[in-house]
Curated annotation (Swiss-Prot):
PANTHER family: RNA POLYMERASE II SUBUNIT B1 CTD PHOSPHATASE RPAP2-RELATED. One of its GO terms (molecular function) is RNA polymerase core enzyme binding. Probable RNA polymerase II subunit B1 C-terminal domain (CTD) phosphatase that regulates RNA polymerase II transcription. May have functional redundancy with RTR1. It comes from Saccharomyces cerevisiae (strain ATCC 204508 / S288c). Zn(2+) binds at C75, C80, C99, H103. A zinc finger (RTR1-type) spans 52-123. Keywords: Cytoplasm, Hydrolase, Metal-binding, Nucleus, Protein phosphatase, Transcription, Transcription regulation, Zinc, Zinc-finger. It catalyses: O-phospho-L-seryl-[protein] + H2O = L-seryl-[protein] + phosphate; O-phospho-L-threonyl-[protein] + H2O = L-threonyl-[protein] + phosphate. Its EC number is 3.1.3.16. The lineage of its organism: Eukaryota, Fungi, Dikarya, Ascomycota, Saccharomycotina. This is RNA polymerase II subunit B1 CTD phosphatase RTR2. Present with 1050 molecules/cell in log phase SD medium.
Amino acid sequence: MQIITTTFIQKVILGSHQLHEQLSIVEARMIESAIVSMLTESFCENEQTLKYLARLLSPMSYMDVINARRGKKICGYPLCYKSAAENSSDGFFIHSMYCNNYHSKCSLYLMRQLSQTPLHERRGVHLTSYINLEFDDMYSVSLLEELVGSEVPIDTVKSLITSFKDLEFDDTYKNEPLPLDVYFGQLTTDEETCIE
C-alpha cells in the first residue's frame, strides 16, 4: 500500500486546479473521484494529512471512500492500512467496514464533522499557494485520537459519550469492550478535566 502525504495531495490531485478560486462542478467531481481512487489502495501518512484531506470531503464522498476500501477488504478508516474484520454468518464470511470498533467510531466521528457544502461551492479551499485562516475554521476537523490523547474538558467528554450511543454503524465488535469506553466509564462528574 502507498502512503499518502499532504504534499502528494497538493501536487497530484490539486496541482492542475490552481488557476482559479472557484471549482466547477466537473473539477470538484474530478477531485473527489481522485481522492476515492487514491484512498482505495493507500492510507494517510498521519493525522495532519487526514485533516487536510477532510477539507475536501463531504459525508457522501467520505462514504464513497469507506465503501471503496471495503470492496478491497481494507479498514474504512483512511489512517489505517489493516484488513477489515470478518464476521461469520450462516457459514458465509462477511467483511466489516473496519478492522475494529475503535476505528469505526473514529471514522464516524470524523464523518459527522465534514461539511455538507459541495466542494464546488467551497471557494478557494483547494488552493495550495496560500493559507486562508477562514478555511481552517470553516472546514477544520478534529480526530477522535486527538481528543483521547489530550486534556479534554469534562463537558466535551460528556457530549462525546452521548454521541457514541448513536454510533452503531458497524456492529462487528458490538459486544467487545472498547478501551475508550472503559476510559470514559472511569470519569466522575466532579472532575473539571480528564487526562489520559
